[in-house]
Amino acid sequence: IAKELKFGESINYKDFALISKADLLSLMVGEFPELQGVMGAIYASEDAQFKNIATAIEDHYKPKFSGDSLPRDSFGDYAALAEKFETLIGLFSINEYPTGDKDPFSLRRNAIGIIRIIIEKDIALNFSGLIDKHMPKDNKDAGSILKAFIYERLSNYLKDKNFTSNEVDAVIS
């Protein structure tokens, strides 16, 4: 997914993937889960090799809630998109969907985060093609279900931005 999103040549996305979750093992994050990412950024900024990805480590969880800020730079944008797509594709591929008001894996939040980053940061991304390429072939329905799930969130996002139902339907179809 990182290659599809074109992380950029100046930052090694493999280094990012290797250390972006290292703070989850720390006692600090274990005791204060809200510091997830924040502590990772602090740890990374202490190592000259990883200083250039410290901000992205903190930002790749964003947005964490409705109205939260978006990542501060393009690498953070791409890292957040990769994180959210990986979560959605992984869970939908094993038929883990939100039901009713239950969403234990925050899949709705991840989908809305993808939509906000793509639209508000003006990122050109064919998420339908990305899903087709990375969804396991043994679960053909999961890709269609995931696309419908994201389109439903996109529809609601656009309506919240005062687009009419006709305008939204024209864009989504």
Regions of interest found by a model, annotated:
Residues 1-173:
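Amphipathic alpha-helical "coupling" segments that flank catalytic cores
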